[in-house]
Amino acid sequence: MAGANEIDMVISVGKFLQGNYEEVFEEIQEIKLSCRDAKLKVILEAGLYPTPQDLYRACILAMEAGADYIKTSTGKDAVASLYNAYVMCRAIVDFHEKTGVKVGFKAAGGIVTTQDALLYLTIVKGVLGEEWVNTTDFRIGASRLANNILSAVTKEEVKYF
């Protein structure tokens, strides 16, 4: 297979918060169609939503439009919190129960220590269940965590990622 296996896109948070839901939905849907066989990961920028309800609705909209994964953040803006991860996982559960479609979850931004990673794992296990705890359905984007682990193992400062 030539080309990308996955495509990342960032949801238009501003358009969503202005109530332009149809426009955001269509944008995600168009990108999904362009992906062909590649998986679409929609980055929510979870730290930018004023309420948990807004974040939840954005997750549902992204999944209904065709997201194969939803991701907390790029790490460039306000990073997601553990509570945001919980809200996103609840949205995945509700969507799965309604449609039978299994959507993956990726936590990213601000995950620096193994303790941070374990907290996200605990949320995924507790909310989504054991069947989501695999490399396909649950991921952690944590370049600083990787550097910290490599530094601890090699006993030298590593800034590889």
Predicted regions and their residues:
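Alpha/beta enzyme core
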Residues: 1-105, 114-143, 153-161
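Terminal helix/beta-alpha structural elements that buttress the NAD(P)+-binding lobe
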Residues: 108
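Short donor-sugar binding/catalytic loops of nucleotide-sugar-dependent glycosyltransferases
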Residues: 111
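Short C-terminal tail/terminal secondary-structure segment
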Residues: 145-149
